[in-house]
């Protein structure tokens, strides 16, 4: 079974993850988001429970 032989695919997987972790990820994290989070105060609304007819 060729899937059990890690020789061909393990090096490719390791190279891909190292490339992503060391090169691509820092470049992507340097961008500023287009919609930064705001300091809004969350408002909670008062809800009244619904009365069940059989209780």
Curated annotation (Swiss-Prot):
UniProt record similarity statement: Belongs to the ATPase protein 8 family.
Protein name as it appears in the record: ATP synthase F(0) complex subunit 8
Transmembrane spans: 7-24
Gene of this entry: MT-ATP8
Main location: mitochondrion
One Pfam family from the record: ATP-synt_8
Oligomer and partners: Component of the ATP synthase complex composed at least of ATP5F1A/subunit alpha, ATP5F1B/subunit beta, ATP5MC1/subunit c (homooctomer), MT-ATP6/subunit a, MT-ATP8/subunit 8, ATP5ME/subunit e, ATP5MF/subunit f, ATP5MG/subunit g, ATP5MK/subunit k, ATP5MJ/subunit j, ATP5F1C/subunit gamma, ATP5F1D/subunit delta, ATP5F1E/subunit epsilon, ATP5PF/subunit F6, ATP5PB/subunit b, ATP5PD/subunit d, ATP5PO/subunit OSCP.
Role description: Subunit 8, of the mitochondrial membrane ATP synthase complex (F(1)F(0) ATP synthase or Complex V) that produces ATP from ADP in the presence of a proton gradient across the membrane which is generated by electron transport complexes of the respiratory chain. ATP synthase complex consist of a soluble F(1) head domain - the catalytic core - and a membrane F(1) domain - the membrane proton channel. These two domains are linked by a central stalk rotating inside the F(1) region and a stationary peripheral stalk.
InterPro entries for this protein: ATP8_metazoa, ATPase_protein_8
GO molecular function, one term: proton transmembrane transporter activity
Alphabetical UniProt keywords: ATP synthesis, CF(0), Hydrogen ion transport, Ion transport, Membrane, Mitochondrion, Transmembrane, Transmembrane helix, Transport
Signal peptide positions (record): none
Bilayer topology term: Single-pass membrane protein
């Amino acid at each position: 079974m060729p899937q059990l032989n890690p020789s061909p695919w393990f090096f490719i997987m390791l190279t891909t993850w190292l490339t992503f972790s060391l090169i691509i990820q820092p470049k992507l994290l340097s961008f500023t988001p287009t919609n930064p989070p705001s300091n809004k105060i969350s408002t909670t609304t008062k809800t009244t429970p619904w009365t069940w007819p059989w209780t």
